[in-house]
């Protein structure tokens, strides 16, 4: 408990001190801030103008520092750190290209996903080398174990990449991604502690909770900084890999239900648009806008209302998971 407290306050205080200076630095470097989509909600062109991205850099520094100081650098923790940093690098390049071109499109989606899958597959293969014979087995819920066999490696890679991009899609409103990530890390860390999977994984989760809470202080509406792709892609990958390490990938889908809903809304929107355009010559939409948080914005829900209601849903689903499915 003392160690967990040290990790939490080290990450939170470090981030809380660094963010104001980092925000000032980013505003000097990029006066226009993160490029905003003109086709998005009209309010974003005003409320999110000149807000700098790349807050994920401080999240990573603040979270990894106490991990290096207080946690044991087991193979699992080292793999978590490496995968997180690889995805952070990819996100940084994407953010940099957006700022350089002053356009909301950075790296192409195909390029990002290809690189993500390569990194994730390598990471899972490394994990397989030093894991026990039960490596391919995962827990669905109470007493139900599934053995994926040879399919486990691509499945685990899919979880990591899917989680990374799901957090990225969710990061569209002030505080939305941060609140969802905090909930996911809290309950995955709790599962790791309850099942005694690895106390160091619990400390890893606590470190990120502290760092993201310090970020949330400056990211609540109206946000002073965004986490950017450097933050969302890396934090999402860390969540996905954490669920893989504690063998609770299926439960993570319920704990991170908002991430799943956000991703499905985009898939449904794009698929239905392409289908109707092919069949009728004109594309139609299921939602007013996707991801689904923008749909509710179009229905004139305020950002704070959407964020809080989504947070309530994720907490309820997480408590249900711990109570009835673990």
Curated annotation (Swiss-Prot):
Q: What is the top-level taxon of the source organism?
A: Bacteria
In the bilayer, the protein is annotated as: Multi-pass membrane protein
Q: Give the residue spans that cross the bilayer.
A: 2-22, 51-71, 73-93, 113-133, 143-163, 175-195, 199-219, 225-245, 250-270, 305-325
The catalysed reaction is: UDP-N-acetyl-alpha-D-muramoyl-L-alanyl-gamma-D-glutamyl-meso-2,6-diaminopimeloyl-D-alanyl-D-alanine + di-trans,octa-cis-undecaprenyl phosphate = di-trans,octa-cis-undecaprenyl diphospho-N-acetyl-alpha-D-muramoyl-L-alanyl-D-glutamyl-meso-2,6-diaminopimeloyl-D-alanyl-D-alanine + UMP
Q: Which PROSITE patterns match?
A: MRAY_2 (PS01348)
Q: Which UniProt keywords apply?
A: Cell cycle, Cell division, Cell membrane, Cell shape, Cell wall biogenesis/degradation, Magnesium, Membrane, Metal-binding, Peptidoglycan synthesis, Transferase, Transmembrane, Transmembrane helix
Q: Which cofactor(s) does the record list? A: Mg(2+)
Biological pathway: Cell wall biogenesis; peptidoglycan biosynthesis
Q: Which top EC class is named for this enzyme in its record?
A: transferase
User: What pairs make up the disulfide bonds?
Assistant: none
Q: Kindly give the InterPro entries that the UniProt entry links to this protein.
A: Glycosyl_transferase_4 (IPR000715), PNAcMuramoyl-5peptid_Trfase (IPR003524), PNAcMuramoyl-5peptid_Trfase_CS (IPR018480)
Q: Which PANTHER family match?
A: PHOSPHO-N-ACETYLMURAMOYL-PENTAPEPTIDE-TRANSFERASE, PHOSPHO-N-ACETYLMURAMOYL-PENTAPEPTIDE-TRANSFERASE HOMOLOG
> What HAMAP family is this protein classified in?
MraY
Protein name according to UniProt: Phospho-N-acetylmuramoyl-pentapeptide-transferase
Say which species the protein is native to.
Wolbachia pipientis wMel
